[in-house]
Every structure is written in C-alpha cells, then in structure tokens.
C-alpha cells in the first residue's frame, strides 16, 4: 500500500466520513490483498486478518 501519492490515475479519493485508505490481508498470505477501500477508523489486526491503513484518503 502506497500512501500519499498524488498520481491522478492511481490515486483514490474517499467519500466524506471514510477518509482512510486501507488494505486487508489474510495472515496466511500477506502478499495478496483480500479487500481494499475506504474506512472511517483503521481496524485492529486479528489472528486471521491484518489491516494496513493510510492516514490519508489517497492510496494506490
């Protein structure tokens, strides 16, 4: 997950209220993101799932 890049093609701006970009990985395979998108609060990691969050609404 690359944060704070301002490349228009690759960047994503989140809707109001969900101003953090995140990626979700399964702990069994940290190389392939399962889900990505915008969220209001960065979730905590669990035994099965790891979250990687940006502190901005732009990511690629």
UniProtKB/Swiss-Prot annotation:
<protein>
    <recommendedName>
        <fullName>Cytotoxin 1</fullName>
    </recommendedName>
</protein>
<keyword id="KW-1015">Disulfide bond</keyword>
<keyword id="KW-0632">Potassium channel impairing toxin</keyword>
<keyword id="KW-0472">Membrane</keyword>
<dbReference type="InterPro" id="IPR045860">
    <property type="entry name" value="Snake_toxin-like_sf"/>
</dbReference>
<feature type="disulfide bond">
    <location>
        <begin position="54"/>
        <end position="59"/>
    </location>
</feature>
<comment type="subunit">
    <text>Monomer, or heterodimer with alpha-cobratoxin (AC P01391); disulfide-linked.</text>
</comment>
<feature type="disulfide bond">
    <location>
        <begin position="42"/>
        <end position="53"/>
    </location>
</feature>
<keyword id="KW-1052">Target cell membrane</keyword>
<comment type="function">
    <text>Heterodimer: has no cytolytic activity, but retains most of the alpha-cobratoxin capacity to compete with alpha-bungarotoxin for binding to Torpedo and alpha-7/CHRNA7 nicotinic acetylcholine receptors (nAChRs) as well as to Lymnea stagnalis acetylcholine-binding protein.</text>
</comment>
<keyword id="KW-0123">Cardiotoxin</keyword>
<dbReference type="InterPro" id="IPR003572">
    <property type="entry name" value="Cytotoxin_Cobra"/>
</dbReference>
<dbReference type="Pfam" id="PF21947">
    <property type="entry name" value="Toxin_cobra-type"/>
</dbReference>
<feature type="disulfide bond">
    <location>
        <begin position="14"/>
        <end position="38"/>
    </location>
</feature>
<dbReference type="GO" id="GO:0031640">
    <property type="term" value="P:killing of cells of another organism"/>
</dbReference>
<dbReference type="InterPro" id="IPR054131">
    <property type="entry name" value="Toxin_cobra-type"/>
</dbReference>
<comment type="similarity">
    <text>Belongs to the three-finger toxin family. Short-chain subfamily. Type IA cytotoxin sub-subfamily.</text>
</comment>
<keyword id="KW-1220">Voltage-gated potassium channel impairing toxin</keyword>
<dbReference type="GO" id="GO:0044218">
    <property type="term" value="C:other organism cell membrane"/>
</dbReference>
<keyword id="KW-0964">Secreted</keyword>
<feature type="disulfide bond">
    <location>
        <begin position="3"/>
        <end position="21"/>
    </location>
</feature>
<dbReference type="GO" id="GO:0016020">
    <property type="term" value="C:membrane"/>
</dbReference>
<keyword id="KW-0204">Cytolysis</keyword>
<keyword id="KW-0800">Toxin</keyword>
<dbReference type="GO" id="GO:0015459">
    <property type="term" value="F:potassium channel regulator activity"/>
</dbReference>
<dbReference type="GO" id="GO:0090729">
    <property type="term" value="F:toxin activity"/>
</dbReference>
<dbReference type="GO" id="GO:0005576">
    <property type="term" value="C:extracellular region"/>
</dbReference>
<keyword id="KW-1053">Target membrane</keyword>
<comment type="function">
    <text>Monomer: shows cytolytic activity (apoptosis is induced in C2C12 cells, but no cytotoxicity is observed on INS-1E). In addition, this toxin shows insulinotropic activity that may be mediated by the modulation of potassium channels (Kv). It induces the increase of intracellular calcium release. It induces insulin secretion from rat INS-1E cells in absence and in presence of glucose, without affecting cell viability and integrity. In presence of glucose, the insulinotropic activity is increased, suggesting a possible synergistic effect with glucose.</text>
</comment>
<dbReference type="InterPro" id="IPR018354">
    <property type="entry name" value="Snake_toxin_con_site"/>
</dbReference>
<dbReference type="InterPro" id="IPR003571">
    <property type="entry name" value="Snake_3FTx"/>
</dbReference>
<keyword id="KW-0872">Ion channel impairing toxin</keyword>
């Amino acid at each position: 997950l690359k944060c704070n890049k301002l490349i228009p093609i690759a960047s994503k701006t989140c809707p109001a209220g969900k101003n953090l970009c995140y990626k979700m990985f399964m702990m069994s395979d940290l190389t392939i993101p399962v889900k990505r998108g915008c969220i209001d609060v960065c979730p905590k990691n669990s035994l099965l799932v790891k979250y990687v969050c940006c502190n901005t609404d732009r990511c690629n």
